[in-house]
Amino acid sequence: MIDFLGDWKRSSYCGELRGGHIGQEVTLMGWVSKRRDHGGLIFVDLRDRDGISQIVFDPERCPEAHAKAESARNEYVLAIRGTVAARPEGTVNPKMKTGEIEVLVTECKLLNPSKALPFTLDGFVDVNENIRLKYRYLDLRTGTLQQNLMLRSKVAQLTRSYLSDNGFIELETPFLTKSTPEGARDFLVPSRINKGEFYALPQSPQLFKQILMVSGFDRYFQIVRCFRDEDLRADRQPEFTQIDCEMSFIDREDIITVMEGLMARIFTEARGVKVELPIERMTYQEAIRRFGVDNPDLRFGLELVELSDIVKNSGFKVFADVVNGGGIVKGMNVKGAGAMSRKEIDDLTEFAKIYGAKGLAYVKMTAEGWQSPIAKFFTPEEIATMDKAFDAKEGDLLLFVADKPKVVNDSLGKLRNHLAAKMGLTDPNVFRFVWITDFPLLEWDEEAKRWAAVHHPFTAPMDEDLQYVESDPGRCRAKAYDLVLNGNEIGGGSIRIHQEEVQSLMFKMLGLSEENARSKFGFLLDALEYGTPPHGGIAFGLDRLMMLITGSDSIRDVIAFPKTQKGACLMSDAPSGVDALQLRELGIRLAAK
């Protein structure tokens, strides 16, 4: 028999009760997490979002409530009234927040039963993730996911409070916008009223937040959903959330200072971690030189060492020919890894090949010196010079790649991260921030045979480099900056172009005709002609930030209703087909598959 809630009101959450509540009458509501029948007394662990309380059903005290407890099973929904009591001596559970008390039931309502669960909620390590996503409403009852999402809510509240205190105004920008596909593909929304025309869901509020600066709002922020129709991986979703900010009459230093304060507030209050300010900075060129990537993980060493000048005249033609042909040779010293087996080194070689390396040379440092197939090609002086460059000691393993600069940096940069994970060097409880600055403004796209924006087309060049935008584009640096945490880019921003003629020049450099630029971005170009202030901003990926704060392996563990890597919601069965009438109203006819 199912009971109605009636006029019952909850007095406490299950996780709130402590020794100080002993003797109080309470009303609790929640789910049966566990039920134990001791041949008379029935013990139920009653769970809600705040925690668990042990509930005791005694047939002598309340036979009616005891009968309901006998029929209850896991995930049944109960409401109980009772008295908080101290647990008997020897039964206190110090691992539980409520472990010193129990509630002696005087009344019970069985509000709803539950079917048998497709998986248990107290440890689902071996449960297929697709099953968890199909039954997401059950998955979300687990403590870890609930804690993740409640912490996410706290981070959002901290963000709003901090930015509001610093003069930012929270404003919404449109979700139905114009398609300007310059990067990832847009999600398109057909217009019923304007048949044959489409809105696009925004990949970011970029243009609208710049226009808000033109409009004089000075400081804007928004915690906003964005959409990209792209191939997915563990830290990507088709819909994602950004902490989006823009400021007027500022330079890079102003933005960095304010945003460092935001990160310090979030990590102190949400994670109990002090962020040392100011955050370390590194130019793009330094990051590539030392770590091979522009998002370096600074929790460990394994820095790259440039060896080109040492080996360019050596007897090892593989290295010498690469350097003399315009390539480079770099290596890294994997400290204490000299005992690594040949198979393990072969596995590292195959990993490096994924990123374009043709091979991976190695040297094991022994008491006798170099142990390596390439040792015979180098003079003692060359070996000594390389040993010094590597700070090589007995027991170390030296790894080398020779190729074009991009291949060398990509392969060794990724190999560095791979080795750190393999060797346990990435402590999830250590948080190392670094700002990466002075990015290139443009990069040459070999496939398209044109220049492409490294960040986006609205990023301003350095003042001193503006003169080279047409004559020497590869020389230009951008007023761009990324915030990297433990090897993950968590935020990216720039000072924007605020002059129409410079923005038009940038579009021209990206291969857009004047007509095409006007068609796609005419409203921005028009706005820039009406007294646009210098401005800039940044956007933080909230999903990725929460993944790092919580130590999760995937952003799917910090999003309430994520999609799969194929962009599907297994719970609601989206995306799905629509009926013919809806398509006719939109003027759409589907092509045959």
Swiss-Prot record:
The keyword GTP-binding does not apply. ATP binds at R228, D229, E230, Q237, E489, G541, L542, D543, R544. It holds the Pfam family GAD. It is found in: Cytoplasm. InterPro entries: Aa-tRNA-synt_II, aa-tRNA-synth_II, aa-tRNA-synth_II/BPL/LPL, Asp-tRNA-ligase_1, Asp-tRNA-ligase_1_N, Asp/Asn-tRNA-synth_IIb, AspRS_core, GAD-like_sf. GO terms for molecular function: aspartate-tRNA ligase activity; aspartate-tRNA(Asn) ligase activity; ATP binding; nucleic acid binding. It catalyses: tRNA(Asx) + L-aspartate + ATP = L-aspartyl-tRNA(Asx) + AMP + diphosphate. L-aspartate binds at E182, R228, H455, R496. Keywords: Aminoacyl-tRNA synthetase, ATP-binding, Cytoplasm, Ligase, Nucleotide-binding, Protein biosynthesis. Signal peptide: none annotated. The record marks H38, G90 as: Important for tRNA non-discrimination. One of its GO terms (biological process) is aspartyl-tRNA aminoacylation. Residues 206-209 are annotated as: Aspartate. Aspartyl-tRNA synthetase with relaxed tRNA specificity since it is able to aspartylate not only its cognate tRNA(Asp) but also tRNA(Asn). Reaction proceeds in two steps: L-aspartate is first activated by ATP to form Asp-AMP and then transferred to the acceptor end of tRNA(Asp/Asn). Belongs to the class-II aminoacyl-tRNA synthetase family. Type 1 subfamily. PANTHER family: ASPARTATE--TRNA LIGASE, MITOCHONDRIAL (PTHR22594:SF5), ASPARTYL/LYSYL-TRNA SYNTHETASE (PTHR22594). Homodimer. This is Aspartate--tRNA(Asp/Asn) ligase.
